[in-house]
Amino acid sequence: MHGEGITITCSQCGVQYTLDEYGKLSAVNVETKFTHVPDWFAWERECVKKEIADGAYQMQAPVDIYMLVDTKRLYHVGEGELSHNAQGFLLKGCDGKLTYDQKPIATYSLNSDFFWYEIGDMISIGDTKALYYCFPRTKISVAKVRIAAEELYKIAKAEKDQKKA
């Protein structure tokens, strides 16, 4: 999914909706199925869950990499590739000097944003040592990645809890 102005477009099927000043959705090129954003979002979540269950979910994108290592500023450290699948996130970059992976169990929620500080769409992963702010260089749905991270966490947590029992 991506948005521009008042229009939201599904990247997968091309369905377009507009959002009015009252928060109501109206379909542009199909019959209206959703009139409220939470309904659309719940439907998106179900689609991502199905993609994960079918083993079809994966994301891979070239990214510009910034790091937050102190409270002073965000440092641009180079370029790389961010991937996400059932095994979690993998970030490689900076001419082979950076490799960071984050398992689904470590991603209860994901910091993602649209047009973050007018730089671009952003996905942030990391740990207590550093946060990696990844700005995709190609069009991907950061909202879908966030939903997938949350759903993969739920699966990993259920598996972990089952092992304890």
Model-derived regions: residue spans:
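Hydrophobic residues embedded in beta-strands of well-ordered beta-sheets
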Residues: I8, F89-L90, I123
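Anionic N-terminal interaction surfaces
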Residues: L25-S83
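Phosphoinositide-binding peripheral membrane targeting modules
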Residues: K72-E81, N85-I119
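Broad, structure-driven detector of short, well-ordered beta-strand segments within folded domains
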Residues: H2, Y17, E79-Q87, Y133-C134
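Acidic, low-complexity intrinsically disordered regions
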Residues: C13, H36-D39, S112
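Cys/His-rich short segments
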Residues: H2-T32
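Short, surface-exposed beta-strand/loop "edge" segments at domain boundaries and coil↔beta transitions
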Residues: Q16-T18, M67, R73-Y75, L91, ...
